[in-house]
């Protein structure tokens, strides 16, 4: 009999291997940035880094099917993507059974880009495919405050405005939204370098919108551990894998340090 994986743990292994240990409907939300097969490598933040292990591509069709299997009914899933990978990823997720609701476009913390930057537009946004297994409504959160004073009626007979917004746009740009990634100044200050590092505050917003406290958030490609930190920020548990030993060590250390600072108990191990 296969043992269930531990909550609040980052496993040093391939995501597909971890899938084989996870029962059906075990996780409450998926939030992940799977490899696109582009072997991303640059001198980001003036800290050259090696190619990402496993970034030569995955069997995305199998990945989509397994993601659907382990996700609880009536739950949300977010998959980062790129403009040139989006059609294929969309089709794989749809074939796996997901109901695809939106493609979110979120401003980066710094303008990125490689290749012909004199003949193409610099990439200043992250794309995420937002899916549902069944149907789950968004939580009412205190993340975005309405500009209008609470109780204001825009017209006679209309419902009074609430203090916090209950709907979110598909494009997150501007000062009221957190950026999708950390900029190079943050990376150098914290000595956390990863070519596709995500902003934990931004991820925590998605987690607060799409899950309840104590629920389990899954990320099969933990990278530097932003999803684990974001889950703890929001009072949720996490589970994930990272195949690259160096990044796995970084993720485990980062999660441990956050838990220590926040005085949150629970195991964080490889």
How should these model regions be labeled?
Residues 24, 31, 40-41, 47, ...:
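Class I S-adenosyl-L-methionine
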Residues 12-17, 268:
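Conserved SAM/SAH-binding loop
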Residues 56-111:
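Conserved Class I SAM-dependent methyltransferase catalytic core
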Residues 2-10:
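Beta-strand-turn-beta hairpins that frame and shape the catalytic cleft
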Residues 10-13, 50-61, 193-201:
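Conserved phosphate-coordination/catalytic loops
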Residues 25-76, 234:
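SAM-dependent methyltransferase catalytic-core segment centered on the flexible catalytic loop
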Residues 18-24:
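Short conserved loop adjoining the S-adenosyl-L-methionine
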Residues 18, 84-89, 230, 250:
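Phosphate- and divalent-cation-binding pockets in alpha/beta enzyme and binding domains
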